[in-house]
């Protein structure tokens, strides 16, 4: 059986793609006060605006109301995935080739569970990182979580320098 997050993902992802957004993450939390948290990113690389979040929120709210997945009252929060966004899907690694990433693993790989380096390749369910000391090959299924890292290079691009 699918989790509520998976069910929500299945019913909203296509609509968000049609609107020009990537669904990065769905979180359902709370016991007494339920919250559906949605993280989005732009498919064309543009910054996410408050207006974008508002439009996505309206669309998702309408879909969730029709599908009636959540029995009780809930709050819906839509926000940008941010500069140090999570990399959840394998495809994300190809999109961010050359970017610095911090990867936490489910189990030891070469005696470590935490790696930071540039994404140099992503293919056949494997991620290739160029770390300070070496190149590392990581099986995607071994990744617990991963985030982009804000580097000076990225910061300068954001400032337009």
From Swiss-Prot:
GO CC, one annotated term: cytosol
Presence of the UniProt keyword Cytoplasm in the record: yes
Cited InterPro entries: Ribosome_maturation_RimP (IPR003728), RimP_C (IPR028998), RimP_C_sf (IPR036847), RimP_N (IPR028989), RimP_N_sf (IPR035956)
Name of the gene encoding the protein in the UniProt record: rimP
Coiled-coil boundaries: none
Species in which this protein is naturally found: Rickettsia typhi (strain ATCC VR-144 / Wilmington)
UniProt keyword annotations, A-Z: Cytoplasm, Ribosome biogenesis
Domain of life: Bacteria
Protein purpose: Required for maturation of 30S ribosomal subunits.
Location(s) in or outside the cell: Cytoplasm
Name of one Pfam family that matches: DUF150_C
Family recorded in the similarity comment: Belongs to the RimP family.
This protein's name: Ribosome maturation factor RimP
GO biological process annotation, one example: ribosomal small subunit assembly
């Amino acid at each position: 059986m699918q989790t509520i997050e998976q069910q929500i993902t299945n019913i909203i992802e296509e609509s968000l793609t049609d609107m020009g957004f990537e669904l990065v993450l769905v979180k359902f939390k709370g016991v007494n006060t339920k919250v559906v948290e949605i993280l989005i990113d732009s498919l064309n690389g543009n910054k996410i605006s408050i207006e974008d979040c508002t439009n996505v929120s309206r669309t998702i709210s309408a879909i969730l109301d029709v599908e009636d997945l959540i029995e009780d009252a809930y709050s819906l929060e839509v926000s940008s995935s941010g500069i140090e966004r999570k990399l959840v899907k394998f495809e994300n690694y190809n999109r961010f080739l050359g970017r610095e990433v911090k990867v936490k693993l489910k189990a030891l790989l070469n005696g470590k569970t935490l790696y930071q380096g540039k994404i140099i390749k992503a293919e056949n369910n494997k991620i290739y990182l160029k770390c300070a000391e070496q190149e590392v090959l990581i099986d995607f299924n071994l990744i617990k979580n991963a985030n982009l890292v804000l580097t000076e290079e990225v910061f300068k691009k954001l400032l337009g320098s």
